[in-house]
Amino acid sequence: MTSQLIKKIVTGDEIRNAFLKFYSEKLHKIIPSASLIPDDPTVMLTIAGMLPFKPVFLGLKERPSKRATSSQKCIRTNDIENVGVTARHHTFFEMLGNFSFGDYFKREAIQWAWELVTNIYQLSVENIIVSVFHEDEESAKIWRDEIGIHPDRIVKLGEEDNFWSSGKTGPCGPCSELYYDFHPEKGLQNIDLEDGDRFIEFYNLVFMQYNRDSNGKLTDLKFKNIDTGMGLERMAQILQEKQNNYETDLIFPIIQKICEIANIDYFSSDDKNKISLKIIGDHTRAVIHLISDGVAASNLGRGYILRRLIRRMVRHGRLLGITNEFLPHIATVGINLMQNNYPDLKNNNDLILNEIKIEEIRFRETLERGEKLLDELISSGQKLISGFKAFELYDTYGFPLELTVEIAEENSISVDVKGFEEEMNAQKERAKAASSNIDLTLEGSLEREIDLFNKTVFNGYDLLLSEAEIKGIFLDSTLVKQASEGQKVLIVLDQTTFYGESGGQVGDIGTIFSKDLEVLVDNVMRKKNVFLHYGTIKKGILTIGQKVKTNVSSSNRAKAAANHTATHLLQSALKSVVNESVGQKGSLVAFNKLRFDFNSSNPISKDQISKIETLVNSWIMENHALEIKNMSKSEALEKGAVAMFGEKYDDEVRVVNVPGVSMELCGGTHVKTTSELGSFKIISEEGISAGVRRIEALSGQSALDYFSDRNALVNQLSDLLKANPNQLFERVNNLQAELINKNKEIQKMKDEIAYFKYSSIKSSAEIVNSFSILVNQIDGLDGNSLQSAALNLTSHLGNKAIVILGGIPNPENRKLLFVVSLGDDPVKIGLHAGKIINEIARICSGGGGGKPNFAQAGAKDIDKLSDALDYAKNYLQKTLDSHSDK
């Protein structure tokens, strides 16, 4: 035995540490958890412990060692409706795993798994059942003959349960799973591993030994691999003897805090409240890790997943009776609970809490808008709320279906529940397709062929002109041997001076040429460290093996270099002027401008922008010489170098240092001294999503051109306003004051016209069953004036007033306006201005809405105005007559 038992392992931290220590002693290299934002473009989030090793399994990346072990944070949302409902479904979970890359195989994997669970975790043999693929006699034999498990404890299952594959083609193989039996007293006859109350699968051993081709044929892999996974939360439930994962020390402290805020007790709560508590507890862990790994709430991709999780937390908080802001308090508990194993949570504490706070406040406002939308649907007169609209309320505004149904029924309206379920199922299918599978296949000719090329050597930091050899030519993503004049091509070289788009910086442009060849290069991309040169052949024939020269446009390279250095200076200035916690969320370094996205909950003030510009320009004038060095990532971070949030870096990194000003990990091109930038100017600052701001700026010649254009504009305005530049401010102020006075005079005239028309009709009110009804047409008034006339008439007629006005503001526009205003008494007998105006406006192809005592609407068909007003009179006559009969 390689690991000696010291004490019984119980806590989540102890379980994790014991797993890693055990396999470390078996010569496995401990690999830190990768980010939840994967390098793999086929999946949105890290959904399995093996995902960071996918390039190794595909042979696209060198293995970190022959053996590896990790505790990988993961997120899955394809079964989100089961979170909190079942005992063990989660969005966020930790997967403990041990991996072999062409080293040990079934025997060692099974033996060590058994040693770990029985000797280290001290599980009783009586509580363990194992499953194997029914055709994998080798694994069954190891379990039976070498481990000594009784045959009755070995369950053979089919391909659906115990044969792992990533897709229709690619690496695959049988697996063996370990189950914990909570009720061994029930015996071993007729075991049903699908019985979730009795069994829980906690350790899966995948034996990756085959490759499946497009015909379904299995062939042995050259190197056989092991991929295992043990759910930390499930093992905690077992060892801590809890009813479910949520009551373990990994999650329950968060739930206790929720109970404290909601002033309820978990164990005496009903099932409905427990589900809400579990959902908030689960989602808290997912949310803090997503934000820490660089995800910002938005309506797309990962940002939408984050937003959806936060909104579910708010909604379930409301179901628990929590009406005030509470998520930051819950998140703080989650951070404190996990920061020892994930120190990035502590480092990003302020960012996490701020992002959650902003999103919670924003969603509470959104909920109010959702309630208004539902009110509009009800007041529109529809008798059925469609499944699409009900799902929109649920998905966009967080309105649960049962609440929509309840409110609709109160207003005698039905909801298309079946249509809602169809929309829900369609979304689930989209989610599963996007997040359930790890694709270990390479689709597309270009994708596959790129793997055939060696890494492109980039020598463009010091050179713009150099020699190279053509290694690959693509036409329409197909690898060819040659291409000719006029064709658009994608070229792979052995080495290049062209910078490939990365780190926000655009790719270089220029030419690839020889004596009889000229290719205009208009973009360069990087894919798997292979540089792809996009261009058009202007002269000659391009062939594999051809010797050429690469010539980068020096003017455009200089512009990009200046903007990239300016971006570094901008980030340092933001940290200095706004907040040290400001971090990059994205960037664009183009030839003509730069764009920088960063986290900030508030807009940057004009005063702050001025200070940022002044600071950057002072650094430019100080003529700092840049220092660029390669060093280990750990050394760079120790020296204080700034790394982009969520970005992946190699062990050796390139550090760009502006002494005393900025130090960042960066692979981009830069100027030699800051004075080469010339000048710096911010041209815009705006919010692009919740908690994320964007600055666009110029440097060098682009900044000078901007100043020149602005100066020309000032001169044009001076000529137009007949004032010299120094008097423009005063001149515009005077013009604005004159305009305000003129508008007041115009409004006064409109009010006089409205009063005249109001006075001419106020005596025409009719008395019906003691109510004063006035239905009339008033043309030539805008919306405000018509509203004012209606309110004045209502005030004049008193509590029993019913005023309905319609009119044409401007005959040329051919639009109608309607206003309905009611006194207190008509409202008391059930009249509703919003419902009345909808019926009237519909006659004229319009619509509107409002409150019980006041509403307004617009319409298009002016020829039906008289019909609409006649309808209003008849409707009121019938309604009031029927009321008098009661």
From Swiss-Prot:
Binds 1 zinc ion per subunit. GO terms for biological process: alanyl-tRNA aminoacylation. InterPro entries: aa-tRNA-synth_II/BPL/LPL (IPR045864), Ala-tRNA-lgiase_IIc (IPR002318), Ala-tRNA-ligase_IIc_anticod-bd (IPR018162), Ala-tRNA-synth_IIc_core (IPR018165), Ala-tRNA-synth_IIc_N (IPR018164), Ala-tRNA_ligase (IPR050058), Ala_tRNA_ligase_euk/bac (IPR023033), DHHA1_dom (IPR003156). GO terms for cellular component: cytosol. Keywords: Aminoacyl-tRNA synthetase, ATP-binding, Cytoplasm, Ligase, Metal-binding, Nucleotide-binding, Protein biosynthesis, RNA-binding, tRNA-binding, Zinc. Its EC number is 6.1.1.7. It holds the Pfam family DHHA1. Its cofactor is Zn(2+). It catalyses: tRNA(Ala) + L-alanine + ATP = L-alanyl-tRNA(Ala) + AMP + diphosphate. Catalyzes the attachment of alanine to tRNA(Ala) in a two-step reaction: alanine is first activated by ATP to form Ala-AMP and then transferred to the acceptor end of tRNA(Ala). Also edits incorrectly charged Ser-tRNA(Ala) and Gly-tRNA(Ala) via its editing domain. Belongs to the class-II aminoacyl-tRNA synthetase family. This is Alanine--tRNA ligase.
